Structure formats: C-alpha cells, structure tokens
C-alpha cells in the first residue's frame, strides 16, 4: 500500500487481456450505476447487463461507494459541471493525461479517471448525444491499455483496488475524495 514497488498486492489475474476485460466490465457497471442514480432506466446507454463473478462484484461495490461519496461533494460537482464538452475527446485526454502527468500512479487516480468518464457519459446523455457514450468508454479503455495496464499488472491486477481501499471506512473514503478533489481542482484550473 506504500507504493514501494514490492510484490503485487492484489492477487488477482494480471494478464493484459484479463485486466482489460475486467476494466471494461467495471467501467460499464460504474457508468450504468451512475446513470441509474440520475433517473432510473437508461436504455440510451445501449449497454447490456453483464453477469459478474464474485470478485468483480466486490470491485464494483467498492467503486460505487467511492462514486457515491464523490457525487455528494458539491465543489467537485460544480467544477465538473463547468467543464466545457464542446470538444469532448480533447477534454477527456487532457484531463486523463494531467491526472497521471507526474508519473505517480495510484488506485485513487484510476477511480477518478472512471468517475470523470462517467460524468462525460452522463453529460452526453443529458445533451442527447448517445453516440458519444461508447466513444467515451472506448477512450477510457484505450487510455487504460496504453498508460495504466502495466501499473495495474504490477499491483496484482484489479484485486489491488480492494487491497488499496480494503473495505473503505468513511475516513478512508473522505481522505481519498479530498485527494481526488485536490487533483481535480488543479486539472480544471489548468484547463481554464
């Protein structure tokens, strides 16, 4: 958990294919959950419900709890609402690159990337640009493959997320949210 580069802590599958497959399931589930909380059924997403194994369900629950906490942070929501999405690809890749620009990788930033992608998808839903939804998911998975895959493998696969957060206590989640908020403030100030 200290990032010292010791043995992988997650203990999950670490093949590139399995990490990308699990990442896609987690991203899709996270976006469906966020959209569902916005207003019930969202057939416009065009995403089918995919059965998850026990490990993926645990990961999804962890992401949902963190997403709930981020949703309740009004300052973060205000900043996200202010993001201009006229050129969403540029915005997505600028924010994603900025999140990891210092070379420090951690699960909080990976979750922040998923959260940002979900917010862009929800904006696309609200502005009735449904073709953008799969595109944003594709950008997120491309970024994951190109920039984060090796790091996730080094952490022992996606199960490293659970090792990192464990069963998040309110204190852990609050510290995490404060970190994401600080990073997000920096990102959006630079974009402004």
Curated annotation (Swiss-Prot):
Post-translational modification (record): Ubiquitinated in the absence of XRCC6/Ku70. Ubiquitinated on Lys-128 and Lys-190. 'Lys-63'-linked polyubiquitin chains on Lys-128 are removed by USP12.
Chain ranges passing through the membrane: 172-192
GO MF annotation terms: BH3 domain binding; channel activity; lipid binding; protein homodimerization activity
Domain of life of the organism encoding this protein: Eukaryota
CDD domains: Bcl-2_like
Listed PROSITE patterns: BCL2_FAMILY (PS50062), BH1 (PS01080), BH2 (PS01258), BH3 (PS01259)
Modified residues annotated as N-acetylmethionine in this record: 1
Cross-link (Glycyl lysine isopeptide (Lys-Gly) (interchain with G-Cter in ubiquitin)): 128, 190
Keyword tags: Acetylation, Apoptosis, Cytoplasm, Isopeptide bond, Membrane, Mitochondrion, Mitochondrion outer membrane, Nucleus, Transmembrane, Transmembrane helix, Ubl conjugation
Motif (BH3): 59-73
InterPro entries cross-referenced by the UniProt entry: Bcl-2-like_sf, Bcl-2_BH1-3, Bcl-2_fam, Bcl2-like, Bcl2_BH1_motif_CS, Bcl2_BH2_motif_CS, Bcl2_BH3_motif_CS
Motif BH1 per UniProt: ranges: 98-118
Motif (BH2): 150-165
GO terms under biological process: apoptotic mitochondrial changes; apoptotic signaling pathway; B cell apoptotic process; establishment or maintenance of transmembrane electrochemical gradient; extrinsic apoptotic signaling pathway in absence of ligand; intrinsic apoptotic signaling pathway; intrinsic apoptotic signaling pathway in response to DNA damage; mitochondrial fragmentation involved in apoptotic process
CC terms in the record's Gene Ontology section: BAX complex; Bcl-2 family protein complex; cytoplasm; cytosol; endoplasmic reticulum; endoplasmic reticulum membrane; mitochondrial outer membrane; mitochondrial permeability transition pore complex
Function: Plays a role in the mitochondrial apoptotic process. Under normal conditions, BAX is largely cytosolic via constant retrotranslocation from mitochondria to the cytosol mediated by BCL2L1/Bcl-xL, which avoids accumulation of toxic BAX levels at the mitochondrial outer membrane (MOM). Under stress conditions, undergoes a conformation change that causes translocation to the mitochondrion membrane, leading to the release of cytochrome c that then triggers apoptosis. Promotes activation of CASP3, and thereby apoptosis.
Quaternary assembly: Homodimer. Forms higher oligomers under stress conditions. Forms heterooligomers with BAK. Interacts with BCL2L11. Interaction with BCL2L11 promotes BAX oligomerization and association with mitochondrial membranes, with subsequent release of cytochrome c. Forms heterodimers with BCL2, BCL2L1 isoform Bcl-X(L), BCL2L2, MCL1 and A1. Interacts with SH3GLB1. Interacts with SFN and YWHAZ; the interaction occurs in the cytoplasm. Under stress conditions, JNK-mediated phosphorylation of SFN and YWHAZ, releases BAX to mitochondria.
Family (UniProt): Belongs to the Bcl-2 family.
Domain-related comment: Intact BH3 motif is required by BIK, BID, BAK, BAD and BAX for their pro-apoptotic activity and for their interaction with anti-apoptotic members of the Bcl-2 family.
Name of the protein: Apoptosis regulator BAX
Source organism of this protein record: Bos taurus (Bovine)
Lineage, top ranks: Eukaryota, Metazoa, Chordata, Craniata, Vertebrata
């Amino acid at each position: 958990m200290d990032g010292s580069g010791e043995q992988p802590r997650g203990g999950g599958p670490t093949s590139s294919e399995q990490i990308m497959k699990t990442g896609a399931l987690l991203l899709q589930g996270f976006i469906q959950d966020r959209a569902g909380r916005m207003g019930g059924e969202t057939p416009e997403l065009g995403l089918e419900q995919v059965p998850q194994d026990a490990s993926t369900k645990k990961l999804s629950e962890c992401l949902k709890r963190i997403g709930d906490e981020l949703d309740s942070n009004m300052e973060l929501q205000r900043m996200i609402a202010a993001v201009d999405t006229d050129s969403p690809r540029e915005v997505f890749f600028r924010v994603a690159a900025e999140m990891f620009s210092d070379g420090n990788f951690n699960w909080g930033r990976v979750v922040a990337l998923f959260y940002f992608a979900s917010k862009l998808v929800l904006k696309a839903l609200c502005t009735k640009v449904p073709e953008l939804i799969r595109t944003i998911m594709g950008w997120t998975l491309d970024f994951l493959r190109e920039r984060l895959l090796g790091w996730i493998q080094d952490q022992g696969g996606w199960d490293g997320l659970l090792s990192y957060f464990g069963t998040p206590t309110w204190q852990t989640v609050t510290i995490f949210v404060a970190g994401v908020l600080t990073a997000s403030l920096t990102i959006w100030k630079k974009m402004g």
